[in-house]
């Protein structure tokens, strides 16, 4: 009989969002008249920007024209998109990148998982807690961990507590680790890292020959000046960091699928015998073998995101979501709740009232307010007692949801 990958059996029962879906489905079936408002999974609700949609259509039309038809594209992405990203997304930050250092993909979630293909299993990995579950679960899947303990911590991983007491900013680990996951603006807490904080991580990584996986999926939602949008704004990061970015939330591409990963040519890792090897070359080899590239029309649409017209339209949508975040944040505060985030990120991280558990609060909001959010404990043990709400809803639904919460909890 064929044998399976036993590591999958170590995973905690049910990925967070499917479990939310299961509970919501059960409640809906029992209460068919309830109008449920979903502020849980961070999916967007506003349509693609007109300039992006036009470029998307143009890309499809090109495929109907024999002279412009495109078949297989480069696995790394078309240069017209990569060059646009270099000029419009990175140069304004003072970051200089080469065409060979940007890889276009169909999602940051995939890249955050697939990047593990080029790293040895005996690397010591540090993950923030609470955290986007994909970081944790994919390390379990590849066999880097033992079993989970009663709290949900997996043997073999180093967890960096992000708590109310430390402002949800983890301390630099005292021991040596090889790979560090950082996400800023942070999902789920909505916090950001200053240049001083990121410099401390870069200095640690350089001193310990570690690699930082920097998830910048929400950088476009930063509203305050002086907050870094890229790890490469920090001197030396090109020698110790891989950056992941996504068009999903920035441009409403959750159903379109496009992202990018930056692997600098200066970034090296060691072989078993100590030889230094370029991670850029290894990632290129991995992508060329396992990935066929993002479709041409999608990349045409992605390039239009950074046109003057496209970015102006997208900025309006981002502002719409961040106004939702303000309304949620202030509404929850009026209800007497302690709230974090929602200023530089589209997520609000609230403290559950009266010491209630995260899942009990989920059930309370669902049954009493018909509002769905995300239990903080689903992001890790340190998320227990907290709850995440997303600002990606329609304005009317956001206002209705907050009104319901205020009436039931105030």
Curated annotation (Swiss-Prot):
Annotated pyridoxal 5'-phosphate binding sites: 72, 108-109, 132, 187, 218, 246-248, 257, 292
MF-aspect GO terms: L,L-diaminopimelate aminotransferase activity; pyridoxal phosphate binding
Residues annotated as binding substrate: 15, 42, 109, 132, 187, 292, 388
Its EC number(s): 2.6.1.83
Chain ranges passing through the membrane: none
N6-(pyridoxal phosphate)lysine, modified sites: 249
Cofactors that this protein relies on: pyridoxal 5'-phosphate
One Pfam assignment: Aminotran_1_2
Key word Transferase present: yes
Involved pathway(s): Amino-acid biosynthesis; L-lysine biosynthesis via DAP pathway; LL-2,6-diaminopimelate from (S)-tetrahydrodipicolinate (aminotransferase route): step 1/1
EC top class, as a word: transferase
GO term, biological process aspect, one: lysine biosynthetic process via diaminopimelate
Keywords carried by this UniProt record: Aminotransferase, Pyridoxal phosphate, Transferase
Subunit note: Homodimer.
Its biological purpose: Involved in the synthesis of meso-diaminopimelate (m-DAP or DL-DAP), required for both lysine and peptidoglycan biosynthesis. Catalyzes the direct conversion of tetrahydrodipicolinate to LL-diaminopimelate.
UniProt record similarity statement: Belongs to the class-I pyridoxal-phosphate-dependent aminotransferase family. LL-diaminopimelate aminotransferase subfamily.
Name used for this protein in its record: LL-diaminopimelate aminotransferase
Organism: Syntrophotalea carbinolica (strain DSM 2380 / NBRC 103641 / GraBd1)
